[in-house]
Every structure is written in structure tokens, then in C-alpha cells.
Amino acid sequence: MKISIPTAKEMNTDLPYIEALPLREESQAVLDSLAHYSASELESFYKVSAEKAEEEYAHIQTLKDQSAKHYPALKLFDGLMYRHIKRDKLTEAEQAYLKDHVLITSALYGVVPALSPMAPHRLDFLMKLKVAGKTLKSHWKSAYDEALQDEDLIFSLLSSEFETVFSKEIREKMVTFKFMEDKAGQLKIHSTISKKARGAFLTALIEGQVQTVEQARKLRFAGFDYRPDLSSDLELVFVKQV
């Protein structure tokens, strides 16, 4: 059983760094494509300010010359979902669960264990980067599939941009999750609710050592309860009363 989560744009490098691993072939090809851009070209590629583009240019160059500092991926990313994941003061059992079951999907590193070393970088599958003439999604599809092909049960906490990198065969094995708020009988869903809830849900999976769909259905976390009337076999819906 594996749980897949996406990367985030926000990062925190105020952490002890760890030893890097050699870049896999697919990652090196992506890096080589990024390295073709000048700082001013990155400004329009990333749709960011000149200052931010310079920062990203520096990140790419340090990756290229192998001087980049690396951090455990789960702690490096600091978006809303990540800030709601229990990442510190884990018990031995929780550490082991994280190591055995949680994978991060990245447009630069591929599908990797949650505590794998990663360097700060900015890349997602909505960006129009060509790698050897292919889109990022096409470039990664076979490696993404390979990472999960032997799994019978996959919990996906991915956004659609990451989920659709996988082939239909893999996606059909995924159990997905929807998190909603019930305000005076009106069910609402938006990205802030979803991101916070994904982090809280992953924390509940880790703390509960969840291995099955049946166990996941029984979870209560951050005010959310499972709603069988809104769920299906492959989509579990959790609702919070507000």
C-alpha cells in the first residue's frame, strides 16, 4: 500500500541539510532542459518577478554543478498541505510508516520516498517545459507507472495535474479522497479546505497506521467524518460541519 502526495511551491530551507543522491537519468534530462534558460527567460517561463527568476536560476545552477544543499523532501516543502502534516516528534512506528508507505511525486525527481533528499526547485506539470521533444508528463509517464505498478492499493492525495501523469491502468487502482465543509446544509469544496484536510488526513493515516480502505473510512480527524452516502468504492468523501 502506498500513499502519493504532490510537491508544493512553498519551501522552507531553515533545516539541517542531508546528503544528496545522484540524479536519476530522467531527472538529469529535466535539469538539462531547465539549464538552457537564462534568468530573464525564466521570468516568463515561471511567470514570476525578476528577483524570483534570479533565485530559481541560482537553484538550477547549483543543481547543475552539484553544489545544491539537499533536505528531506517532506520537510523541505512547506505549502498548506505540508504544514498540516505531522512531520516532527514522530514515534518509531510513525517514522517506519512514513518510510514504508508515503511517496512524493515530483516533476524533477519522479516518484520518491517522502524523506528523500531534494534541493529547492520550482517545477510542476502545468509548466510548458520540453524534455527531448516531449512534454513533462510524457517524459515521466513510464517512470511514474513503474513506481506504482506492483501496488494493489494506492491512496492518492494528488491534484489532477500530478494524477494524470500516471496511465489509466494505474489511475484505476487509485483510491481518491474528497474533503468538504457543510455550512447550514450546503456542501462546499475549495482548494484551501482540500489542502489543509489532505495534510490532516495524512497525519491521521500515519498515527492510525492505516493499511486498508476500511480502516481509512473509520478515521475522524480535524472535524471531518466519513460520509458513506457521498462516497464510492474508489472515492472516499469526508465532511466537516462548520
PLM region descriptions:
Residues 86-233, 237-242:
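Internal, well-folded beta-alpha domain core
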